[in-house]
């Protein structure tokens, strides 16, 4: 059976982190993914995770920290036992408007990640939908990022691929040699779940999981990370999604 992780960002609007960790353990999770808002005291966080029987196998890090203080990112990752690090986002104002700009951004990520790779940790990019907007004809930013950064690993957010108008399994296969993690999330039918920004619990939305997960399992992907960008009830999301995903 696939071991599913949980992106703690999904629970950012709910109770104290130690309660979230306990809830996830009770729900049956054994892995979590971190994000920048929770790294203030890595040793205390590691203690809470250990007590609950959870491992933080992957983490998201702001590009500014990776570039300006890579040693801090590495220290946090080691304290928490992470196996891979990803930069998760680029603000709209900072996004390139040309193919050359996206290629340069990939090179920037490649250079920023060198200390992390030298420390023995995979480092890469996590996508949204803006990487699938055509630029200068039929070129796509995600291709350009990965071309500019040939050593970058990929955490493919499967639902954002679909929102971007692409078939997730095609991109899983296209970059199977770079894929070490996926975000497992679901999209509601058009016009539904508007109070949750159009997201749905995994297995209860529009994603074709038979096609997508079968493609992922053809790769060496190590981490399957549940995420919901704005759930009304994080415990509901965590439990319903894990129950559904375990049937994939």
Predicted features, each with a name:
Residues 114, 125, 160, 204-206:
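Gly/Ser/Thr-rich helix-start
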Residues 33, 58, 86, 124, ...:
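Conserved beta-strand positions in the central sheet of alpha/beta enzyme cores
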Residues 31, 43, 63-154:
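Active-site acidic/histidine proton-transfer and metal-coordination neighborhood
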